[in-house]
């Protein structure tokens, strides 16, 4: 009986570990989504403060980190204006880290980026922006079949 209990605890711990990948290229949101899928990965979902902290800590350790950097998140309101969902799961965004006055929710700004820009005081905050007209770093995460049982 103890073996089963240990296995369940181990699976629970594994289910919460996220593995990120940031390639050395920038793309628009749609190309970023296609790129992650081509690697059998998802665009990153940030569904809790813990997820956000893990992503920030990962980014800070890469060569992509600077005083003015932008990263795509796997969220958009393309399906329904003003209703942001995670592309990998279709779940509504319940945790957010929007910058002040964001999302601005114009019809042209449907995709979500995470910004670290000390010049405009946006420190790891989120912004809605045009999906096609802007290039940012791609953030993919490993797909986890166990994650659906969280």
Swiss-Prot record:
Glycans are attached at residue 67. This is C-type lectin mosGCTL-7. SUPFAM superfamilies: C-type lectin-like (SSF56436). Its main location: secreted. SMART domains: CLECT (SM00034). Antibodies against the protein added to infectious blood meal block the interaction between mosGCTL-7 and envelope protein E of Japanese encephalitis virus and reduce Japanese encephalitis virus infection after feeding. It holds the Pfam family Lectin_C. It comes from Aedes aegypti. It comes from the Eukaryota. GO terms for molecular function: carbohydrate binding. Disulfide bonds join 111-131.
């Amino acid at each position: 009986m103890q073996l089963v209990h240990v296995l369940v605890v181990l699976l629970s711990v594994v289910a919460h570990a996220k593995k990120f990948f940031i390639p050395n290229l920038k793309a628009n949101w749609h190309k970023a989504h296609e790129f992650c899928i081509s690697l059998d990965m998802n665009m990153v979902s940030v569904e809790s403060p813990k997820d956000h902290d893990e992503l920030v800590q990962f980014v800070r350790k890469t060569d992509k980190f600077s005083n003015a950097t932008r990263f795509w998140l796997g969220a958009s309101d393309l399906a329904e204006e003003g209703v942001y969902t995670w592309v990998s799961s279709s779940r509504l965004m319940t945790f957010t880290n929007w910058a002040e006055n964001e999302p601005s929710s114009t019809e042209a700004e449907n995709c979500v980026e995470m910004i670290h820009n000390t010049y405009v005081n946006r420190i790891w905050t989120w912004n809605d922006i045009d999906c096609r007209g802007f290039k940012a770093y791609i953030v993919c995460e490993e797909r986890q079949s166990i994650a659906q049982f969280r």
